[in-house]
Amino acid sequence: LLFWTTKKIADKLISKKAKETGISILAAIISSLTYTFSDSFWFSAVEGEVYAMSSFFTALVFWAIIKWEADVDTNPKSNKWLIFIAFLIGLSIGVHMLSLLVIPAIVLIYYFKKFSFSFNGFIIANIVAVLLLGLIYNIIIPQFVNLAGKFEIFFVNELSLPFNSGTILFFVITISIIIAALVLSKKHNQPNINTAVLAFTFLLIGYMSFFTLIIRSNANTPIDENSPEDAVSLLSYLNREQYGFSPLVHGQYFNTEVEDYANGNPVYVKDEKTKKYIISDDRKSSIPIYDSNGTGLFPRMWSRDQRHVEAYKEWTDLKNLKRKPSFRENLKFFFSFQINHMYFRYFMWNFAGKQNDQQGHGELNNGNWISGFNFIDEQRLGPQKTLPDHLKKNKGKNTYYFLPLILGLIGLFFHAQKNPKDTWSIFLLFFFTG
């Protein structure tokens, strides 16, 4: 997929004569093999996790929008690619939410192909891209199940109908609305609305892969986290409530006092005896309300876990743990730990080299990025030749001498010069997926 995507993009940058030399094929081979043997992807591919499959869906969706872009001027049925993309996004939700982050890039490619460029249009397209991502992630995914759950509780508890009757009726209503929208849009010759409704429909069809969870949970498997046996309990699973809440834009710090507690949403479970849904946890006084004087903008140091508090001290030289951390200290933790240690270090593992495969916590001899150039590595990490043999000869050690990084930067500048629109779309993909 990466090979064909790169070739399509490269073909747009070079002349017809250059295409005949096969230079775009060479670029695609280098691109795809670089990714294949990159540290992050290789690690994802050999561990029992969801990230390799998630990367596959991300690559497949991006390849599909490139195919749409190539077909749209000559094929009147090219919108099938947009519907295919919606279906893939729905399917990918059942693997990992990470695949949704390709949506902004898709919106920008659509904008650049369908509309004449203007500054205002460009800004609006970027805003629409983020809003569409938020719409799918925050509204369609959770609220579809939330509404199904509310229907289920109302029809079972209030109307004394059998279990699942509310869910079935909700799906009947949803399907009826979709059919009506498709018929009306075709009757009134509105192809864009028709395509949008079809895309939404196929997004839901892909999303229905979550039914597998309900089926397996009803089989009472040994691992049955949150027990999502019906629409009512599935919402808790989808909202990842077991992970808690992390303040991103505004919120408390690790030492902020709790002033009061608010009530959360009650948890309903099936009761086979009464044939109703009963409250197993009313979640009264379950949401802490923090002292407003102890909250702030962009709180990075908010966890009360003592191990995390120790990390805050280590990465920011925080001395007084009783006072509210300053915004400067928050930014220091953000840049030193979250950006440098948790992002840039991983980035350089792929583009410069990796010291070893030992878990690193900021020390000089474990898990850092290296380049292979001693005068650079020794400035950052000290003499590498004096490390013990089990670290010097570690099988996870790689040195690329910045070659992947240099190739990437050359490609970035060349691409930006030749086709800034495509460059921005691909940058959004890179930025959102990290």
Predicted features by range, described:
Residues 1-17, 59-64, 406-413:
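Transmembrane-helix motifs of polytopic, lipid-linked glycan transferases
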Residues 2-37, 74-76, 420-430:
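Transmembrane-helix signature of polytopic, membrane-embedded enzymes
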Residues 10, 14-22, 61-81, 110-119:
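Membrane-interface transmembrane helices that cradle and orient dolichyl/undecaprenyl
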Residues 31-33, 81-95:
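Membrane-interface alpha helices of multi-pass inner-membrane proteins
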Residues 40-51:
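Short acidic/glycine- and proline-prone juxtamembrane loop motifs at membrane-interface regions
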Residues 69-70, 102-167, 171-196:
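Perimembrane helix-loop-helix junctions
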Residues 198-207, 400-410, 419-434:
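Transmembrane alpha-helix segments characteristic
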Residues 217-413:
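Lumenal/periplasmic acceptor-binding loop at the mouth of the active site in multi-pass
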